[in-house]
Swiss-Prot record:
Native source organism of the sequence: Cupriavidus necator (strain ATCC 17699 / DSM 428 / KCTC 22496 / NCIMB 10442 / H16 / Stanier 337)
Swiss-Prot/TrEMBL catalytic activity: 3-amino-2-oxopropyl phosphate + 1-deoxy-D-xylulose 5-phosphate = pyridoxine 5'-phosphate + phosphate + 2 H2O + H(+)
Role: Catalyzes the complicated ring closure reaction between the two acyclic compounds 1-deoxy-D-xylulose-5-phosphate (DXP) and 3-amino-2-oxopropyl phosphate (1-amino-acetone-3-phosphate or AAP) to form pyridoxine 5'-phosphate (PNP) and inorganic phosphate.
Active-site residues annotated for this sequence: 51 (proton acceptor), 78 (proton acceptor), 199 (proton donor)
Pfam families in alphabetical order: PdxJ
Name of the protein in question: Pyridoxine 5'-phosphate synthase
Domain of life: Bacteria
Site (Transition state stabilizer): 159
Subunit comment: Homooctamer; tetramer of dimers.
Chief location bin: cytoplasm
Underlying gene: pdxJ
HAMAP family named in the record: PdxJ
Record EC number: 2.6.99.2
This protein's UniProt keywords: Cytoplasm, Pyridoxine biosynthesis, Transferase
GO cellular component terms, semicolon-separated: cytosol
Length: 260
């Protein structure tokens, strides 16, 4: 099944980290995350997201440098709040940098950045990145204090952490987490922020989040890489974008893998 989606309704950022994870598992040069990014653009991705972690467990410095001049859309570079990463970002100058919390022992990002608790450090980082012409996003929980702190430190964009929504064990728990995200979207907009969201979203839980009209962009990676094993990379990207757009427009698309 080939999917086509209208552009401009809601943006899809395709995260290519786990293409690099697959490459690094065998120490080979394939699969190439650069090729994955360019094919994702052709399939309808509105931007490419990649996380340069301090331990370089998937994306490497060379990947970021090689990809930056080749993208036709936007690069959204995720990185920790360290001077090393800020300096790398200011050297490469992606269109967007999303500051995220990072712990070496975690499998994946486990929560939002504590902007309120690290206010001066975050504010200084926002100023450094903005001075290099980079738009700053802060990956935070859907918490009123964190959203207010993000606005106060000068970040124009927030990305709301959807991991607790994605990991909810019961419908009631998921409904509660969804309400928190929806309230966070409203709070972000009241502060004049662009509101994005991401983490843990996949083909059967993305619809309610994508339907929220205040969300500009969703960043999704692992689910697309996993689905591509069966559906093919470009069609996996097309399918995710089509599901998101259908949710925003109030229409329906077949579930992943369902017949047309």
């Amino acid at each position: 099944m080939i999917f086509h989606a209208n552009p401009g309704v809601i943006d899809l950022g395709v995260n290519i980290d786990h293409v690099a994870t697959l490459r690094n598992a065998r120490g080979t040069v394939y699969p190439d995350p650069i090729r994955a990014a360019l094919l994702a653009e052709q399939a309808g991705a509105d931007l490419i997201t990649l996380h340069l972690r301090e331990d370089r467990r998937h994306i490497r410095d060379a990947d970021v440098r090689a990809l930056r001049p080749q993208l036709a859309t936007r690069m959204n570079l995720e990185c920790a709040l360290t001077q090393e990463m800020l300096d790398i970002a200011c050297e490469i100058r992606p269109q967007d940098v999303c500051l995220v919390p990072e712990r070496r022992e975690e499998v994946t990002t486990e929560g939002g950045l504590d902007v309120a608790g690290r206010f001066e450090q975050v504010k200084a980082a926002c100023a450094q990145l903005a001075g290099a012409g980079i738009r700053v996003s802060l990956f935070i929980d859907a918490d009123a204090d964190q959203i207010a702190a993000a606005a106060a430190c000068g970040a124009p964009v927030i990305e709301l952490h959807t991991g607790r929504y994605a990991d909810a064990h019961t419908p009631d728990e998921q409904a509660l987490e969804f309400r928190r995200i929806a309230d966070g979207v409203d709070a972000g907009q009241k502060h004049g922020l662009v509101v994005n969201a991401g983490h843990g979203l996949h083909y059967t839980n993305v619809q309610p989040i994508a339907a929220l009209p205040g969300i500009k962009e969703l960043n999704i990676g692992h689910a697309i890489v996993a689905h591509a094993v069966f559906a093919g990379w470009e069609n996996a990207v097309r399918e995710m974008k089509a599901i998101m757009v259908a949710a925003r427009l109030g229409t329906r698309y077949p579930a992943a893998g369902a017949p047309a």
